[in-house]
Amino acid sequence: MKPLFPRRFLIASAAAVMVLTACGGIDPVVPEAAFTLQLLHVSDADGSDSTALNSVANLSGLVQKFRAQYPQQTLTVSSGDNYIPGPRFNAAYDPSLRALLGKEEVGRADMAFLNALGIQASAIGNHELDLGTRQFASIIKPDGAWGGARFPYLSYNVDFSADSEVAGLKLANGGNAAEQAGKLTGWTVVHVGSQKIGVIAASSPVFANITSPGGLVFKPAMASGEVDVNGLAAEIQRGVDEITAAGINKVVLLAHMQSLTIEKALASRLKNVDIIVAGGSNTLLSDANDVLRAGDKSAGDYPYQTQDAAGQPTVVVNVDADYKYLGRFMAPFDAKGVLIPQRFDSQLSGAWATSETDDSAGGVTVSGLVSQVRDAIKAVLKAKDGNVFGKTAEFLEGRRAAVRNEETNFGNLTADANLWYARLLDPTVQISLKNGGGIRSEIGEVLAMPGATTAAVLTAPKANAEANRLAGEISQLAVETSLKFNNKLWVFDVTATQLKTLLEHGVAVLGSQGRFPQVGGMSFSYDPARTAQTLDANFAVTTAGERIRSLKVGTDVVVQNGVVVGNAQRTFRMVTLNFLAEGTSTAAGGGDGYPFPATANFVNLVNLETAMNAATAGGAASTSTALLGSEQDAFMKYMKSQFGSTAFGVKDTPPAQDLRIQNLSQRSDTVLN
C-alpha cells in the first residue's frame, strides 16, 4: 500500500491542504482550490468471503485515519454490490450475531460493516436485489433492535412505486442524506463542512434480466441485449439538472453499470457531473504511487480523466472488490465548483491497498464493531469449512474472467454434477446447461509472491488445520461460496432448434457476460466473428444467430456447418437452473436473457426439489447440507459419490485446448471428429 505517512503529512495539517495542493511547480495561472473534497469509496464486496472478511478491519482503520485528517472535507460512499447471497451473507442469521446486530438476519452483518465505515450514500447494485426486494428491504430498514442502514440507497433511473416491498421507503429527491437512513431516493445532498455535495446514482437497466427486482422498473428499458447509453445518459441528466437547479455545483454520480466502458461513455455524455464512482466491474484503477497487492494488475489510471459534454473536466474512479482497496480521491474545486485537474495529487489520491493478515497495518486503529462482527461471522463459517464433500487435486477454475468467457474445469464439473443428479431420478436426461455467471468463485488457492513477475500459481485448496480439513478437500463452505445462488434444478425437453437458439444466446454477447454457458453431455463450437443472435423485448429472435457452427449431444450430430441437421423437432432432455428457465418477475424470458418459453410451455417439466423430496433424495449416495433439488445439493452429493476417495484430477485448459466449448478464434473445430 502507499505509506500512511508520506512526507507532506509530516509537515502539514488538514488545515493547510489548499496551500499544499498549490505546491509542486504548478503554473501560477492555475486557480487555487477553493475547496478540496476527500472522496473515500468502496464497492463490490461480492467475490471472496475470505478476502472481504480478512480485509474489512484494516480498511475500517484506513477510513478512520483519512477521515480524521480531513474531518470537514470527507465524503464516504459505495457504488453498490455491498453484499451477495452466500456463506458470509447467511452467517448473519446465526443467533450468535444477535448481540452485535440487535436482531439476526441474513445480510445484516454486511450492512453493519457499512454503517461502521460511515458510508453516507450507496448506489443499488444488482446483488442487493438477488433475493428480491423483500429481503433488500429487510436489510436496510429498521426491525426491532436492528437499526437498518444508516444511509440512503440511491438510484435515479429506477421507479420504485410499483413494488409494495420498497415503495414505502422511497423519498422525494433532494433531501438531506443525514436524515434519510434506510430510505430510497434518486439523489441526495450530503453536507461536507460548509459545502453541499449532490450525490446521485444510477443502476444498469440490465438488472431486470440478471437479478430479482420484483416490481422495480429500470429506465431506459432494455429493448435489446445492449444498454442504451444515450438514453441512460439522458435519464441521469434529468437528475443532475435537478441538483444544479437547487444551487449545488459539486456532483458525484455513483454508477453501478458493471462495465467501466459504459461509465466512461457516460462521463463524456453528461454535463455538470464532476466525479463518477464506477461499480460492478471490479476494475482496479491506480496511479504510479500505488503499491498493489501481490498478483494484482492495474487496469488503467486513477482517476480516469476526460471532459464532459460541456467541455468541463470530469473523472471516473474505481478500485477492486472485497475491501482489498480503499479508493481515495482528493478533488480540488475552484470557486465555481469546477475540478482543477492541474492540482490533482497522486500521492494522496489512488487505490490504497489493505492487509488481510494485519488489522492494524499502517498503524491504523480499526473499528471495534467491524472486528467484532467479522470475528463472529468467521466463527460461524469456521464450522462449515470442516464439513467435507469430496476431493480435488487441481485448482477448480471459477473466477469471473474465466467462467464468463470459456469452458473451465469447474464449469464442466458442476454441469456434470447437475446431469448426474438429474439422472438419479430420470436416466433419460441427456444434457446440462448453466450460466458462467452462476459460478461465483474458484475452489482452490491463487498464490502470488510479492514482487513476482510471473503468473500466480493455482493450486487445490490448502489445508485448514483449525477446521481439521486436509489439503484438497472440498468443504461445505467452499461449495456455498462458489455456488452462492444455489439455484433449484429443473428438467424438461428442448427441441434441436431450441437447443441451438439457447446456445446462440449464450455466445451472442461476449466479454465476461454472465450468460456464457457451461455445459455437460454436449459439446459445441462457435465463431465469434459471425452474426450474433438478437432478441426483441419479448425475447423472440429477431436476428438468427450464425455463431454456433457444430453441436453434438453424445453421438448425435445436432448442428453441422451452422445448420441444424436431422429432425429439427427431435427432443433432448435437459437439466438447467430455474433462474435460467423462469427468469425474473420482470423479464419475459429466462434469467440472463435466455429465450426459454414461458413456464406453462415447458414440455415434461420436473422440478427436482419436489421430485427429490418425494423420492427421499432419489437414492443419492450421501447426505448434504443443502436444499434438495438444488445445485449445491447436486454438487455435494456428486463429489462425495465420485470423488470421495479418489480426487478429481482434471486440470483447467486454455481456450486453444478446450473440447466442450470450442472458440474458433482460438482453435480449429474438432467437435464432430
Predicted regions and their residues:
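Short amphipathic alpha-helical segments with coiled-coil-like heptad repeat character
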Residues: 2, 284, 426-428
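A short acidic-Thr-Gly-centered motif at the start of a beta-strand
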Residues: 24-25, 483
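Catalytic centers of hydrolytic enzymes
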Residues: 32-38, 42, 47-49, 53-56, ...
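Acidic, metal/ion-coordinating pockets
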Residues: 25-349, 493
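Compositionally biased, intrinsically disordered/low-complexity regions enriched for serine, proline
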Residues: 3, 25-28, 514, 594
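C-terminal motif of bacterial Sec signal peptides marking the signal peptidase cleavage site
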Residues: 19-22
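Bacterial N-terminal signal peptides that target proteins for export
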Residues: 2-11
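Non-catalytic nucleic-acid-binding interfaces of large nucleic-acid enzymes and RNP effectors
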Residues: 14
